[in-house]
């Protein structure tokens, strides 16, 4: 062997400790090192025998069964009603085997339920034994499952409206019917609605405060517990069905969770409820107070004014607006209640119908007196000034030319009739049917506010009474019985003399017939039996059918605008007097006033 490498040994030290290892070339052989490491003195450390598979399928089945059983138990504990546990054993109810789930605030509502989310959330669950009280409710259930519990409770109720009424009174301390009046129909429209909505999500309730502003002029919202109260004054009237459709889509609730009625508008207690509730911190309001709340709660100069009904103001209003019918007066004046204090006082009166009848009678008296004071020229001028728009008089001239009527002769006859020339104040339009006789005369009567007489009422002795209330009259479609009646009783009236006219509830009055228009299919001038009427009636024949366009509209439009242009254009030819000559030196006259002046009225 080679000499050992390293330092030279010293005497006296080699027997005590070996400080250097002996090197050998054999240790540098890698194959020998690997062979030495693989050799082991431990026997049977590795089992090199052949393995048997065994029953692995049965083991896998047992593991799956155990896992399914655990999942089933967890689902039973989650969805099992507490009442069912109490029925089995009261002691079992006080023990909770499943761990309590931690309260988490979730971002998406759709993760509130489901097997996958439940198993995932249970990884952060701490095991504990819980003994809750019977009336207590877990925090997580109060935060996340309150809406579902309220809704299920409502569905289980046999009378959901009664439940909602009771819940409302429990939370707000006042009955729902104390604030509202009942509408039985779902199609009745109203601008203001009171809604009580049960179990609304807080986020949807907050969002509705902004979304409703585009639909309403005034919003009042307050939520207490699971009940939310709305007072909505819409910009346009809505019925109950429309309101429910809007709220169910906006609040994501079922229609059974909503009760709605219009508010009480004349109840001071109800108005104070809304007024005081708006001042509280828990209510949300938008817009100014409605008039029916402000008038009953806010003290101001308007509320201090006298609320006595002034009939003369109502008469003046009806006179200025040309309302003569009782139904029109009552309906139109009631619509003024939000703006006129006198209309409010009239609505609050117990004798509304009597006042309406008296107002209509007074307006008719004033209108009749005004008409009698006017001449025919002034009457025509007043009537055509009320016509809006412009037309062309040539339409009437073309129609007369189409019917082969001499326009100059017609103007002369019309002038005599308007001036009530004796034996010249009656014009007859005769001809075959469908020639436009009634259309022509009716259009003239309409623009001059004349009256139409029907011979069907001739059995009554008052059928000629409208002649005393107009400047021009029309008897349409005169037949043989009517000609006989006129030939027998109306000769003096057609002559322009004063006659005795019997009026209802009055003594016979002395008057003259107004300008009279007649239409008939009979040419009275060819009838010998009516020869005494020939000199009293001026007749014009309409032989041609009335022309119509392809769209079934008249070829000649006989409108108020056409007659306005006709009288304006031919004013001098008809010898109608100038309106400035009829006034007092051309001075403007004050309009008719039938109501007492107020103390602060302008002169």
Swiss-Prot record:
SUPFAM superfamilies reported for this sequence: Origin of replication-binding domain, RBD-like, P-loop containing nucleoside triphosphate hydrolases
Predominant cellular place of this UniProt entry's protein: host cell
Quaternary structure and interacting proteins, as annotated: Can form hexamers. Interacts with E2 protein; this interaction increases E1 DNA binding specificity. Interacts with host DNA polymerase subunit POLA2. Interacts with host single stranded DNA-binding protein RPA1. Interacts with host TOP1; this interaction stimulates the enzymatic activity of TOP1.
Annotated catalysed reactions: Couples ATP hydrolysis with the unwinding of duplex DNA by translocating in the 3'-5' direction; ATP + H2O = ADP + phosphate + H(+)
E.C. no: 5.6.2.4
SF3 helicase domain mapped to chain residues: 405-555
Renumbered residue ranges of the record's region Disordered: 47-68, 578-603
Motif (Nuclear export signal): 88-97
Region (DNA-binding region), start-end ranges: 143-306
InterPro entries from the UniProt entry: Helicase_SF3_DNA-vir, P-loop_NTPase, PPV_DNA_helicase_E1_C, PPV_DNA_helicase_E1_N, PPV_E1_DBD, PPV_E1_DBD_sf, Rep_E1_papillomaV, Znf_lg_T-Ag_D1_dom_sf
Bilayer-spanning residue ranges: none
Protein name per Swiss-Prot or TrEMBL: Replication protein E1
Keywords annotated in UniProt: ATP-binding, DNA replication, DNA-binding, Early protein, Helicase, Host nucleus, Hydrolase, Isomerase, Isopeptide bond, Nucleotide-binding, Phosphoprotein, Ubl conjugation
Biased composition (Polar residues): 586-603
UniProt entry tagged with the keyword Kinase: no
Pfam families in the record: PPV_E1_C, PPV_E1_DBD, PPV_E1_N
Annotated family: Belongs to the papillomaviridae E1 protein family.
Biased composition regions of type Basic and acidic residues, renumbered to the chain: 58-68
GO MF, one annotated term: DNA binding
Function statement: ATP-dependent DNA 3'-5' helicase required for initiation of viral DNA replication. It forms a complex with the viral E2 protein. The E1-E2 complex binds to the replication origin which contains binding sites for both proteins. During the initial step, a dimer of E1 interacts with a dimer of protein E2 leading to a complex that binds the viral origin of replication with high specificity. Then, a second dimer of E1 displaces the E2 dimer in an ATP-dependent manner to form the E1 tetramer.
EC class name: isomerase
Modified residues (Phosphoserine): 81, 89
Source organism of the structure: Human papillomavirus 21
Record's GO cellular component terms: host cell nucleus
A GO BP entry: DNA replication
